A protein has these predicted regions:
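Eukaryotic chromatin- and chromosome-associated nuclear factors
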Residues: 1-410
Length: 410
């Protein structure tokens, strides 16, 4: 499906498994629980069978048990990233038998031969798929860390807050002076609304903080629970003139952010130097650095990262977590009508069923299903507040359903 293929793999850097979704295709085979079975025993309380992926939408897949042919009566949806979905061979490694569904158990005399024929040459999930799911949802932050975050009630200020909870890389933050019964603030860990301890003082931003916090920041002192700069990653991708070969524009990476807008940049076409001598300093306003897609837009040759061919390199297929912000970023493939799960930025504790109602360049107009258009929100195509279908289920977070027709606020 378009949503799965484009969003999770190419643009959903904040979505778990975005870097390995190429392994998930229609037609692949998996082993799942057989719910159409009564052949249980004490040794095998669960029954499993092979199923084919018929359709993919976000993390969700429509499956059909092998042997049903064109019969869709037992088709069912699952979250492919859940622990109940396994690669072919999983049962064999655990000594579990594969038992055909009761509805079709007499359809073939030799089920083993049937499976061999159906599985020969078929694709399945990698054996490490589920462990990668778990790894992809790990946050680089931890609970009890202190941060500086935009004050939701006075957005011209930042305020000291503490991480209370982490769900799927979304952080639940409590301001230092909040009462226990007051609302918390939610945002993604990659949100531009949060900053490390000491950020406001360094850049001259207005800060609301306890006197003891201000005092130790002014003295350069750190607490064990302070969020530090290393939790706010470098790694932004851009295109830059090669300082060692001024005739070429190359794929490059921001390796370090210095004060006053200076960046340490490394050109990606060379072997990485362990002594960091291949880093070069550019100012963020330098005419020698460009947003992703600059060369393509202007029909200029781009020297790709090492290991990639110039004629086939595509930024949308290159694994990177951050992009140099510009409207010139390569065009996404979101389209009107696509379904997703989106945080309501006016009430970011809620993640809701939503639809893309309009696309203008890199901007997406997100409509919350069941609500009036006045509640629509414009989001960037790379926003960390939009997710594929099935994300809430994956991270065990409540998904706010569409508002029922004719419901009244209040």
């Amino acid at each position: 499906m378009q949503f799965n293929e484009i969003y999770i793999r190419c643009l959903g850097f904040q979505a778990p498994m975005s870097d390995c979704w190429d392994n998930v295709i229609v037609g692949m085979k998996v082993e799942v629980e057989n719910t159409d079975c009564d052949n249980f025993s004490e040794d095998f309380p669960d029954s499993f069978w092979v199923a084919s992926v018929l359709e993919i939408s976000g993390y969700k897949a429509l499956l059909r048990y092998e042997g049903f042919g064109d019969n869709c009566s037992k088709d069912f949806w699952v979250n492919l990233c859940s622990s109940s979905v396994h690669p072919v061979g999983w049962c064999a490694t655990r000594g579990k038998p594969l038992i055909p569904p009761k509805t079709i158990e007499n359809k073939f005399q030799d089920w083993k031969d049937f499976l061999v024929r159906r599985l020969t040459g078929a694709r399945t999930l990698p054996s490490t798929f589920y462990s990668k799911v778990q790894d992809s949802m790990k946050s680089r932050f931890r609970c009890d860390l202190n941060l500086e975050v935009v004050d939701k009630n006075r957005i011209s200020h930042v305020k000291v807050a503490t991480i209370e909870k982490i769900v799927g890389k979304r952080l639940q933050l409590r301001y230092y002076d909040s009462q226990p019964n007051e609302d918390v603030f939610w945002c993604h860990e990659d949100s531009p609304l949060i900053h490390p301890v000491g950020w406001a003082r360094r850049v001259g931003h207005t800060l609301d903080a306890p006197p003891a916090y201000v005092d130790r920041c002014s003295k350069g002192l750190r607490d064990k629970d302070d969020a530090t700069e290393d939790l706010f990653p470098m790694g932004m991708k851009l295109e830059a003139i090669d300082p060692l070969n001024l005739s070429e524009i190359c794929a490059a990476t921001v390796k370090q952010v210095l004060n006053d807008g200076y960046l340490m940049i490394r050109v990606d076409c060379y072997d990485e130097d362990p002594n960091l001598v291949d880093w070069f300093c550019y100012h963020i306003t330098s005419p020698c650095i460009f947003p992703i897609g600059f060369c393509a837009k202007n029909e200029l040759p781009l020297t790709p990262p090492k290991g990639y061919l110039p004629n086939t390199f595509n930024w949308n297929e290159y694994p990177c977590s951050h992009w140099f912000c510009s409207s010139d970023r390569p065009m996404h493939k979101f389209t009107t009508g696509m379904k997703l799960e989106a945080a309501d930025l006016m009430n970011p504790q809620y993640v809701c069923v939503a639809t893309i109602s309009r696309v203008v360049d890199r901007l997406l107009k997100v409509h919350f299903d069941g609500w009036e258009e006045e509640y629509d929100q414009w989001l960037d195509c790379a926003s960390c507040d939009i997710y594929p279908v099935g994300w809430c289920e994956l991270v065990s977070r409540r998904l706010e359903p569409p508002r029922p027709p004719n419901s009244v606020e209040g």
